[in-house]
From Swiss-Prot:
Gene responsible for this protein: paaF
Enzyme class of the recorded protein, top EC level: lyase
Annotated PANTHER family: ENOYL-COA HYDRATASE, MITOCHONDRIAL, ENOYL-COA HYDRATASE-RELATED
SUPFAM superfamilies: ClpP/crotonase
Function text: Catalyzes the reversible conversion of enzymatically produced 2,3-dehydroadipyl-CoA into 3-hydroxyadipyl-CoA.
Any one GO BP annotation for this protein: fatty acid beta-oxidation
Name this protein carries in UniProt: 2,3-dehydroadipyl-CoA hydratase
Pathway the protein takes part in: Aromatic compound metabolism; phenylacetate degradation
InterPro entries with a match to the protein in the record: ClpP/crotonase-like_dom_sf, Enoyl-CoA_hyd/isom_CS, Enoyl-CoA_hydra/iso, Enoyl-CoA_hydra_C
NCBIfam families the UniProt entry points to: PRK09674.1 (NF007239)
Length: 255
């Protein structure tokens, strides 16, 4: 049985974490499969958006502790996981997390890495690494504080406490909360809506949004303007404006 189920709905790629016995713990093998699928999707012009989900009880409950327990300092220094996370971060198309149940530790970090997080009412988000004598190591401290602010992020990281889907939405980590049996359906609807837009515009807009968290305002504004200008030379820009003026649905080609 595959630990990552891959399916397609038109221009949307769906990746389902499938390690139920391990609560979808993100071991190196599963991370590598995620990386491979996303890197293939990045260059596949027939794919515009990707959705990552788990099961009804667990999005992903963290890293694989059995795998971690085997590593001493030397093994940790030579761990490939930082490179795998960097490759996930480099995905250039919209990435949506559809979260039901627990998103803890590395599972929460995976959700934070996504562009949009939608959650079921039963979802919980947390970084409990402190209870194990360690700390988040895959972007949790950096992305959580940018998402929910200093006070709540510090409380979660330093106490190990998790928050509900409703609290996550109020804090800005989650965009929408739904009955748990509708979470994936809504995420796929949102992905399909995004996928109707110009692939070039989607990628440029994602790049600009990401830059806003990584550079100073003036540098971000300059990058935004550069990307806006580059889109002016595309066929999709001409098609989008023409379709609007002619009151018809645009037919974007990604050119």
């Amino acid at each position: 049985m595959s630990e990552l189920i891959v399916s397609r709905q038109q221009r949307v790629l769906l990746l389902t974490l499938n390690r139920p016995a391990a609560r979808n713990a993100l071991n190196n093998a599963l991370l590598m499969q995620l990386v491979n699928e996303l890197e293939a999707a990045a260059t596949d012009t027939s794919i515009s958006v990707c959705v990552i989900t788990g099961n009804a009880r667990f999005f992903a409950a963290g890293a694989d502790l059995n795998e971690m327990a085997e590593k001493d300092l030397a093994a940790t220094l030579n761990d490939t996981r930082p490179q795998l996370w960097a490759r996930l971060q480099a995905f250039n198309k919209p990435l949506i997390a559809a979260v039901n149940g627990y998103a803890l530790g590395a599972g929460c970090e995976l959700a934070l890495l996504c562009d949009v997080v939608v959650a079921g009412e039963n979802a919980r988000f947390g970084l409990p690494e402190i209870t194990l004598g360690i700390m988040p190591g895959a972007g949790g401290t950096q992305r959580l504080i940018r998402s929910v602010g200093k006070s709540l992020a510090s409380k979660m990281v330093l106490s190990g406490e998790s928050i509900t889907a409703q609290q996550a939405q109020q804090a800005g980590l989650v965009s929408d909360v739904f009955p748990s049996d509708l979470t994936l359906e809504y995420a796929l609807q949102l992905a399909s809506k995004m996928a109707r837009h110009s692939p070039l515009a989607l990628q440029a807009a994602k790049q600009a949004l990401r830059q806003s968290q990584e550079v100073a305002l003036q540098a971000g504004l300059a990058q935004e303007r550069q990307l806006f200008t580059l889109l002016a030379a595309t066929e999709d820009r001409h098609e989008g404006i023409s379709a609007f003026l002619q009151k018809r649905t645009p037919d974007f080609k990604g050119r």
